[in-house]
A protein has these predicted regions:
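Residue-level detection of beta-strand scaffold positions
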Residues: 22, 45-46, 66
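Extracellular low-complexity, O-glycosylation-prone stalks/linkers
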Residues: 27-47
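Short, solvent-exposed loop/turn segments that connect beta-strands within catalytic domains
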Residues: 40-42, 78-82
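Short S/T/G- and acidic-enriched coil/turn segments that sit immediately N-terminal to beta-strands
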Residues: 52-57
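Beta-strand-rich modules
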Residues: 58-80
Length: 95
C-alpha cells in the first residue's frame, strides 16, 4: 500500500560503500534494498533488512562510479506478503 512506501537517503562515507537510510514503517515490516549502475534497469537486491533497523550498507561497489538505489517494504499478514511501491530512486557517486 502507498503508506508503506519508504523515503530514502543515500551517502557514501567510505571507499566502495554506500549507506542507505530510510524512515521506519512500524513493526513487522521488512525492507528490500536494491542497487544498479543504470537508473531504469539492472537492479540487484543487496539485502533484506528487518524492521528495527533503518539503514543498510552496501559494500564492494566500484569507486568513482555512480550507483542508483531504491528500497521497498514488505509486510506479511496472515501468510500473505504485501509489497509497497519502490521509493524514489536516489543516486550517488561512490568514494
Amino acid at each position: 500500500s502507498s503508506d508503506l512506501t519508504p523515503t530514502i537517503k543515500v551517502k557514501s562515507s567510505a571507499k566502495k560503500k554506500a549507506q542507505i537510510i530510510w524512515n521506519l514503517k512500524g513493526n513487522g515490516v521488512k525492507y528490500q534494498v536494491y542497487y544498479s549502475t543504470k537508473k531504469n534497469k539492472g537492479y540487484k537486491k543487496a539485502a533484506t533488512i528487518n524492521s528495527s533497523k533503518g539503514k543498510a550498507t552496501v559494500k564492494k561497489l566500484k569507486s568513482k562510479k555512480k550507483y542508483y538505489f531504491k528500497v521497498r517494504c514488505s509486510k506479511t499478514v496472515k501468510g500473505h506478503t504485501y509489497y509497497s511501491a519502490y521509493s524514489k530512486i536516489k543516486s550517488i557517486k561512490i568514494k
